[in-house]
Amino acid sequence: MRIAFLGTPAFAVAALDALDWAGHALVTVVAQPDRPAGRGQALREPATKAWARARGVPVLQPEKVRDGTLAAALRALAPDALVVAAYGRILGKDLLTLAPHGAINVHGSLLPRWRGAAPIQWAVAEGERETGVTIMQMDEGLDTGDVLLQRALEIREDDTSETLAPRLAALGGEALVEALRLLEAGAIVPVRQDAAQATLARILEKEDGRIAWTSPARRVSDRLRGFTPWPGAFTTLEGRTLKVLEARPGADAEAPAGEPGEAEVVPGRGLAVACGGGTALLVTRVQLEGRPAQSALDLANGLRRKRFRLGT
């Protein structure tokens, strides 16, 4: 097929690799514009743009996608299908319908669960043990189109959204190639989503990372894993931000007496922090505002205390 590809971050590169390997003709890669990044705020090109430039594939980076300009440019390339993977923009009907096979999306969840911008993060943060990828025929709704193909994937006990994303991306590439093959052969029957089963994976905000010590330790741990690397998990210690970098649910017997947020040194292991329901979170690595990352035990040694309160 002649494919016009729309995608921006590293997650989308696996789909490009799969399309290239399968012999599809990439007529263009459409990515978001270069954005300032890092401490120096230098312009950084999207991962998909770098992939395309290295292979001589034309790149488009429109500031606007709903004024008809992009649709006209793509129509002139006569693609058989648009493939969309984490592009980051809402597409209008003019784009969704310009190719014979329409627009095909690679989505990082088992739709209708986790429709929206952050499906990988929310699946982990909500403690789910399975997720997957959906190849979907796009419509004008938010991830509401008919399902063409799905593949499931286990969420491991120690997965973060950062470790899970590459595995989902690779699975998405494989599923995409299979779906396109079946689509060309007329062997796919689109399945309508059950809207009653839908959940929303809304855009993450910085405040989502603030730890609620009144939650059970398992929920705090799941949120830490889901929100790694951003927004991370953080609390306060005597008015200073304390990032919790590594932690896991501890034995309930380790929970310090007192209110949620009470922290106590567990010799040789870390800090046991009291959480909701009498549970304990064993914190092993942290970063206090203005300091480098360190073990939780080193933090306690520096404070010269074996017990203190977090969230203050």
Swiss-Prot record:
GO terms for molecular function: methionyl-tRNA formyltransferase activity. Pfam families: Formyl_trans_C, Formyl_trans_N. PANTHER family: METHIONYL-TRNA FORMYLTRANSFERASE, METHIONYL-TRNA FORMYLTRANSFERASE, MITOCHONDRIAL. The keyword GTP-binding does not apply. Gene3D superfamilies: Formyl transferase, C-terminal domain, Formyl transferase, N-terminal domain. Attaches a formyl group to the free amino group of methionyl-tRNA(fMet). The formyl group appears to play a dual role in the initiator identity of N-formylmethionyl-tRNA by promoting its recognition by IF2 and preventing the misappropriation of this tRNA by the elongation apparatus. (6S)-5,6,7,8-tetrahydrofolate binds at S109, L110, L111, P112. It comes from Anaeromyxobacter sp. (strain K). Its EC number is 2.1.2.9. PROSITE patterns: GART. It catalyses: L-methionyl-tRNA(fMet) + (6R)-10-formyltetrahydrofolate = N-formyl-L-methionyl-tRNA(fMet) + (6S)-5,6,7,8-tetrahydrofolate + H(+). The keyword Repeat does not apply. This is Methionyl-tRNA formyltransferase.
